Curated annotation (Swiss-Prot):
Belongs to the NAD-dependent glycerol-3-phosphate dehydrogenase family. GO terms for molecular function: glycerol-3-phosphate dehydrogenase [NAD(P)+] activity; NAD binding. The keyword Mitochondrion does not apply. It comes from Stenotrophomonas maltophilia (strain K279a). Catalyzes the reduction of the glycolytic intermediate dihydroxyacetone phosphate (DHAP) to sn-glycerol 3-phosphate (G3P), the key precursor for phospholipid synthesis. Its EC number is 1.1.1.94. The lineage of its organism: Bacteria, Pseudomonadati, Pseudomonadota, Gammaproteobacteria, Lysobacterales. SUPFAM superfamilies: 6-phosphogluconate dehydrogenase C-terminal domain-like, NAD(P)-binding Rossmann-fold domains. This is Glycerol-3-phosphate dehydrogenase [NAD(P)+]. Sn-glycerol 3-phosphate binds at residues 110, 139, 141, 194, 247, 257-259. Gene3D superfamilies: N-(1-d-carboxylethyl)-l-norvaline Dehydrogenase, domain 2 (1.10.1040.10), NAD(P)-binding Rossmann-like Domain (3.40.50.720).
Length: 341
């Protein structure tokens, strides 16, 4: 069990990394935030603001920031990685020789390893070795609301219960509820797939297809999550909780979601390039859609919504063509007989 005297290192000074570092610092933990952008790091360390990702939101005076990875992790009780998925492997590999003995590694990154489609816990385990406690932090949470102190609930799934509990206890507070679990596969799957499905609901809303269509896409999107989860050995209850349904609903309905905003722009006729440029931050769904479908093909699972999103993002179909393809599918039972058995 950690105490408020234990240092925590947070790697990644984007909006979510800054929000979680701010949360930990407000809870009394000595927290150091590492980032690559010297201007952003200086602003956080000296002016207690992240002007690029969370402008106008004050950060705790106690939060320190640095561009020196070795300095950031030195003496840390545990380390939290919060980078985009495409930078996760590189960050963990840089961390490996610097990690203090006994320090567990958690991450709040959502997605798969680009190219291989591997889960991030597989990447971390390969790089860090078998003896390092690992955990994934996930759930319905917008960075801006967390830094504003608005109520939020997340879940921490780990392969060592004591480490997952340590991470959850450090984050848990008056406006931030942290639960625990042991299904890292399900937790990571939900956090990745919801980004793809948020594009679908954004496209539908951008095309002004109505609330019925949005509700249908969310529900059938959850069905896709559950079917892929069953195929890869995840627990269905994980996908029905904060890591799956909770994150799915938030990302599909909240306009703070970058992936939903991407879908809205595409549904209104913008190009992918213009939409991504306008959003101005990493949009995980562009790469994640490929990796979700790679997993689906590997396990022989049909994911029609996710596949149409992938096709639209690659310019293989227009949003209108993707919609027609979904509506033209044959009638069938809502759930396979074997899904919950």
């Amino acid at each position: 069990m950690s105490t408020t005297a234990d240092k925590i290192a947070v790697l990644g000074a984007g909006s979510w990394g800054t929000a979680l570092a701010s949360l930990l610092a407000r809870h009394g933990h000595p927290t150091v935030l590492w980032g690559r952008d010297a201007a952003v790091v200086e602003a956080i360390d000296q002016r207690h603001e992240n002007p690029r990702y969370l402008p106008g939101i004050p950060l705790p005076d106690s939060l320190r920031a640095t561009t020196d990875l070795a300095s950031a992790v030195e003496g840390a009780a545990w380390i939290l990685v919060v980078t985009p998925s495409h930078a996760f492997g590189e960050t963990v590999r840089a961390l490996a020789p610097l990690r203090p003995a006994g320090a567990g590694v958690a991450w709040a990154t959502k997605g798969f390893e680009p190219g291989s489609g591997r889960f991030l816990h597989e990447v971390a385990r390969e790089v860090l070795g078998e003896d390092v406690p690992l955990a994934v932090v996930t759930g319905p949470s917008f960075a801006k609301e967390v830094t504003q102190g608005l109520p939020t609930a997340i879940t921490v799934h780990g392969d060592v219960p004591e480490f997952a509990q340590m991470v959850a206890e450090a984050m848990h507070g008056p406006a931030f509820r942290a639960y625990t679990g042991d299904d890292m596969v399900g937790a990571e799957l939900g956090g990745a797939m919801k980004n793809v499905l948020a594009v679908a609901t954004g496209v539908a809303d951008g095309m002004q297809l109505g609330l019925n269509a949005r509700a249908g896409l969310i529900t059938r999107g959850l069905n896709e999550m559950l079917r892929l989860a069953a195929a890869i050995g995840a627990k269905p209850e994980t996908l029905m909780g904060l890591a799956g349904l909770g994150d799915l609903v938030l990302t599909c309905t909240g306009d703070l979601s970058r992936n939903r905003r991407l879908g809205l722009a595409l549904g209104r006729g913008q190009t992918l390039q213009d939409a991504v440029r306008e959003i101005g931050q990493v949009v995980e769904s562009v790469q994640t859609a490929d990796e979700v479908m790679r997993q689906a093909r590997r396990h022989g699972i049909d994911l029609p919504i996710s596949d149409r999103v992938r096709a639209v993002l690659h310019g293989e179909q227009t949003p209108e063509e993707g919609l027609r393809a979904l509506l033209a599918r044959e009638q069938k039972p809502e759930y396979p007989d074997t899904l919950f058995k």
